[in-house]
Amino acid sequence: MTTKKPCFNVRVYGIIVNNKQQVLLADEYQLNMKMTKFPGGGLQFGEGTADCLRREAMEEFGQEIEVLDHFYTLDYYQPSYFYKECQLLSIYYRARFVEPVRFVISDRPFDFPSMDNGNISFRWKDQAELSPGDMTLPVDQVVAGMLRDQA
């Protein structure tokens, strides 16, 4: 009898809110689809969760963030969106930029020249107007609702 090893997909995301009470969103084209999500990504083996978020910030923004505090951890079973045989574990931290933003912030979603895998753009959205429907991924939808309710 062959026993399949459990598969977990650990994702770490940053909740970055500016002084105008706007939340930073990432619009990405990945795996041949458009998605709006919070900045962040996958935990690598041997990496702590806060370290993962700092690494993802350098990869996505090209600048450092400070991880402030824990916001939310997925506490129910959720299959991974893209890898249904894996269980998702999503962890969200509040974070802030160490220096003023040096990358382009757009005023419209999916502000890149073509729908090619790997393209990403960023925009601010008023926290009070944030809706679960703004987000693509199920757990991001839960977190968006929590953020809106706290506005």
Q: Which residues fall in each region the model found?
A:
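Active-site-adjacent beta-strand/loop module that shapes the phosphate/pyrophosphate-binding cleft
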Residues: 78-107, 146
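NUDIX/MutT-family hydrolases
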Residues: 104-142
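N-terminal strand-loop-strand
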Residues: 1-38, 97
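The catalytic Nudix box helix
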Residues: 38-72
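A generic structural micro-feature
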Residues: 4-8, 35, 83-89, 114-119
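Short, charged/polar surface micro-motifs in flexible loops or helix N-caps
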Residues: 17-22, 31-32, 44-45, 73-78, ...
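Acidic/histidine-enriched, glycine/proline-rich intrinsically disordered or flexible terminal extensions
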Residues: 142-151
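Conserved hydrophobic/aromatic beta-strand scaffold that supports enzyme active sites
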Residues: 15, 92-94, 124
